[in-house]
Amino acid sequence: MDSILRLTSILTWLLSGLWHVGLTATNYNCDDPLASFLSPVAYSSSSDITGSTSSAQLNWRMGTGGWSPADSSAHQWLQLDLGNRVEITAVATQGRYGSADWVTSYHLMFSDTGHNWQQYKQENSIWTFAGNLNADSVVHHKLLHSVRARFIRFVPMEWNRNGNIGMRVEVYGCSYKSDVADFDGQSSLLYRFSQKTMSTLKDVISLKFKSMQGDGVLFHGEGQRGDHITLELQNGRLVLYLNLDDKKAWLSSITPSAILGSLLDDQHWHSVFLERVGKQVNFTVDRNTQHFWTKGETEVLDIDYELSFGGIPVPSKPGTFVKKNFHGCIENLYYNGVNIIDLAKRRKHQIYSGNVTFSCSEPQIVPITFVNSRSSYLFLPGTPQIDGLSVSFQFRTWNEDGLLLSTELSEGSGTLLLILESGTLRLLIKKVTGHGTESLTGRSLNDGRWHSVSINVRRNRVTLTVDNDAVSLAPETSGLQIYSGNSYYFGGCPDNLTVSQCLNPIKAFQGCMRLIFIDNQPKDLISVQQGSLGNFSDLHIDLCSIKDRCLPNYCEHGGHCTQTWTSFYCNCSDTGYTGATCHNSIYEQSCEIYRHRGNKAGFFYVDSDGSGPLGPLQVYCNVTEDKIWMTVQHTITELTQVQGSNSEKPYAMTLNYGGSMEQLEALIDGSEHCEQEVTYRCRRAHLFNTQDEAPFTWWIGRSNERHPYWGGYVPGVQQCGCGLEESCQEIASNTGFLSSKDHLPVTQIIITNSNRTNSEAAWRIGPLRCYGDRHFWNAVSFSTEASYLHFSAFHVEFSADISFFFKTTALSGIFLENLGIKGFLRLEMSSPSEVIFAIDVGNSPIELLVQSPYPLNDNQWHYIQAERNIKETLLQVDNLPKNKREVSDQSNFLLQLSSQLFIGGTSSRQKGFLGCIRSLHLNGQKIDLEERAKITPGVRPGCPGHCSSYGRNCHNGGKCVEKHNGYSCDCTNSPFEGPFCQKEMSALFYSGTSVTYMFQEPYPVAKNTSLSSSAIYKDTAPSKEIVTLSFITAQAPALLLYLKFSPQSFLAILLSRNGSLQIHYQLSKVESHVFTVGSENLANRRVHEVNMNRNGQELSIQVDQQLFSYNFSPEVEFQTVRSLILGKVTETLVLNPEVTQANTLGFVGCLSSVQYNHIAPLKAALRHASIAPVTVQGTLTESSCGSMVESYANGVTTVYSSSDPFGNTDEHEPLTNAIQSDSAFIGGVIAIVTFIAFGVIGIMTHFLYQHKQSHHTNPMKEKEYPENLDSSFRNDIDLQNTVSDCKREYFI
């Protein structure tokens, strides 16, 4: 059996090869002149200056010397009857001899019958041929696609402005032989096999067909085991069903293998080519090809008994068919090299035919096309004053709206209108009195298919029939008296008519009509064309020029295509792409770019190839670290145990990352580093066989290859990383990282040694993690105008998008250029403020200009995005408005570039670009500029100076640091951290929390601070002081910040009893300055920002949005800072009563973004406590002040006191979020401390009162104290008395 299959496949291959050779031979040297020997009667035209068509052969000089119409206007044509169907490969034209008459451009049309013409198209557009520039020269055109027809028409489009239309023509080609079969819709051909079953590994089926209807079976075959192959027309499209040895199913329930073509019921020839090799199938209709893999269990197609063509007959029931039969003609039908129609014509025994004839009978149907939605119409006369009315026709269109018919009825009956509205037919009869009646029927009638419409009015009964579905008007029409009028306007109304003669409440119809009957009489539309019947405007007669603009579908990435008569539109919803053709991704290409655009950490979609074919993939971007990690999670994240596996029954688990391998590979290739953590734990289930070193366990990587090495070790070595480093803590456990990008990601793990007694294994594969974008900072520098980089030609064709960054100081320069045989593409900076995108697809160049209001040669990075698709061309610079231009419908949109792509210059080495270009993308493809620059003179890899453009991204005092592949933000001198110094450093303080920063030589983290910041380390007092902080609290009084100058002098920022902000400057034992800033209670559970700036004797204080200013007197002298304290001051110092009271309770709340000049003490305590001169006492918890605001917002607002700083009066309702447990503890501590404090204060008050009384009764020259009074308490008393006597208080 195998030998028979092999022999059958060889014969099929040979026969199909011979068939292709035969076709090639037919086209070989097919360039004979076909018009030279035609008789004059073979020429016809729309009109002629002599009254009868003159001979118009090439080089003809007799008579009028060629053809000229009686009137040089649109819709003139010259027609040739070539006698039989021939193959036309070229044409040539001249002007009329001895005259100023010639045609400068023209269209070609062809037909088999002299009716139902077809326009010559190239690249899916009506092709315009360039004509002559004088009367004598010959212009020759080789057709890109040969044409098979009997009749050919030359349709002048433009001609000599100083003359008229004049043509002499020649047609080149050769004879065309074919075998044709005509199917009447009730017959079929059967090809019986010599054996019961035909088994094939390869099939080749080819044919051409011309259909009279939109549905019908072209061929069908099936086998008893479920194999089947069926090709049929459905709604004007070809549907292929193909299945190999699968379970048998009814055809109605089978999903089509492929659907191709559209509008295939246009009565024109269409070619089909189907090739199958095993499960791989190539399916071509006309010039559209679809490649796919068929379903089934084998690669052999088994067909039993026969193949049927034209229908599917029911066995044992002659004349009965399963589905609708094909009605039309089939030509040159080949099945695996066998000419089926030739066998039928010769009545070979393999062929059984029904009522099939072998010539193509075609009805003489004349279609018309309404071209213009404003001015197209057709006027046809009718027979007036008939009691009743009858009109019928067929139409097809893509437009939802349009006027189909308008006629003024006789005897004052009113006006009858038939309108297409939102794809539904609306019949409206308007009476002269204003009353009327209407009916709606049909839906989606703008689907491009032919639809039949009939209006019949008889004996006051109005019936509207659409596609055999009849509907009658409402009962009130029984009183209507309707009499036919004498004029019928189809499609629209002329401008010169009165309203009553033709009504058009909607735009004119754009589409095709045919088979028009009025009063049951067919209308001769050729007579309309010749001017002997009716009238028309903007019509194509004897031609239906409908075009399916959604085939092929130019909406990319799964966009849904919809269309009108003149254009198509792409619905990009839920695709992840945008633009006129869904070409541009709405997602960024890496986490690096998301970070660069200011996004925070979270889940994002990353589209690694931008506008390329790969879709977006969801990842997690951790943008809070210096290295931006991109994480792709898979479906199995937990430690998984395995038991009972062996070499015969291995354990295998596949990991699903939620995307294709191509998406993952693109993500990995575009990253600088990738890794996956792997963990393997085992008991009596080894990784490797110690005898022959064969692996017991391995994993599968990206290339579907086995890898026996494990975490931390180099690829190709069967060992674990901890074994290499001799750092294994457990013999039965290994954890490490896989970091070979060529092998990642891990797609499968195999374990074969966990079936021994008491043996088990456990594994865990971590997510795929990558950092770095290899292309975002990929840059080159061009140093001379003659330097450039060159790459292979830019393959664009239908869509082209270009994007890159540039910076320069030059006045002009070309960014890139690519030339073709006819067209080109160029992007350049034409002046310091102008960028031009020029493109030519072969007809005429288009230039888009963007003018910038600012100079582009400022040595800053600027972004350019240019795009050209079949709908529009656009250019954008930075965030300036886009310059966009729609592409003309008739234009040639296929851009073919043949030369090399030049970056930074041109092949002429002139007008080159001086500066830097980076992150160049062409149609989503990332161009590695740096690698090419390494071997190119005059071009250097990399480009310094990123901080000049992106330094503004370093916030809150962060310093921009240059890197080869970008920049980073140094947050050393900032109270913030993170990639852009935007993450606030904040912490929760409790009543006993104290953070002390000692000023001395800078700690190692701050070694690179500027010279201006070094003043705070000297013994001299700083001339400037800047203090910034944010806080949230519900406690008052509260000490926020304390700066110690000496034991007796300090600066304190606190909240007073009423919650207002106070600044205390204690500059000596006797000199104090107190500033009360506003009266607002800031202990209100909200975040407040304080910014204090002292410059010399000037002091400014900003609280939130309010700014206050003050000037110190000139004699005030400031001192050197020794330490800075946040929270409670724990050491024994001389404090005034307000500071003492605020310090007694400490600070309970959240402090963030604390900075004194260039020192960030809170950040030092949280991040560098081991190396910075900072000491932390009590509990300091890193937190977020923002989360506390949310906690407060979710809680109950109550009145609070100093004993309850967070304001919880309801002891049964804890604080929400992260501070619930902490707040309970804090509240208890505060209550105890407050009780003790008030007790101490009470005792002190009592003692001082007694002491004061004795002091007044016994005056002393010097202060005297009891001998048993503690010395520290004496200092407190001194401080209080001094402050009471010398304090200066300011209210601002």
From Swiss-Prot:
Laminin G-like domain residues are: 180-360, 367-544, 778-943, 987-1185
Residues exposed to the Cytoplasmic side:
1245-1292
Keywords carried by this UniProt record: Cell adhesion, Disulfide bond, EGF-like domain, Glycoprotein, Membrane, Repeat, Signal, Transmembrane, Transmembrane helix
Q: Which Pfam families match?
A: EGF, F5_F8_type_C, Laminin_G_2
* Ranges for domain F5/8 type C: 25-174
User: What parts of the sequence cross the membrane?
Assistant: 1224-1244
This molecule's function is given as: May play a role in the correct development and proper functioning of the peripheral and central nervous system and be involved in cell adhesion and intercellular communication.
Q: What family name appears in the similarity comment? A: Belongs to the neurexin family.
Q: What is this protein called?
A: Contactin-associated protein like 5-2
Supply the source organism for this entry.
Answer: Rattus norvegicus (Rat)
